[in-house]
Every structure is written in structure tokens, then in C-alpha cells.
From Swiss-Prot:
Membrane topology category: Single-pass membrane protein
Pfam family, one: PsbJ
Lineage, broadest ranks: Eukaryota, Viridiplantae, Chlorophyta, core chlorophytes, Chlorophyceae
Region forming the signal peptide: none
Function recorded in the entry: One of the components of the core complex of photosystem II (PSII). PSII is a light-driven water:plastoquinone oxidoreductase that uses light energy to abstract electrons from H(2)O, generating O(2) and a proton gradient subsequently used for ATP formation. It consists of a core antenna complex that captures photons, and an electron transfer chain that converts photonic excitation into a charge separation.
Protein name per its UniProtKB record: Photosystem II reaction center protein J
Primary gene name: psbJ
Amino acid sequence: MSNTGTTGRIPLWLVGTVVGTLAIGLLAVFFYGSYVGLGSSL
């Protein structure tokens, strides 16, 4: 990956925001599932 020709690409901050949100969402669902008891099967 090179920093040249970044036009037309998704901004890095947008990628970080989306990835961070998805990661937090998955962690929240996993911890909630394990707290309720559904995640114990995982």
C-alpha cells in the first residue's frame, strides 16, 4: 500500500471509525451474550 494516489479511496479516518465501531459492537454483543448465558456455547 502506498500513500500516493489516495484520490477515490476511502479516507483512513472513516475506515478506522467503521472498524472501531464494528469491533466495539462485536465485543458488546459477545460480552452481553456471555453474561446472559448464550455466549457460553461459544
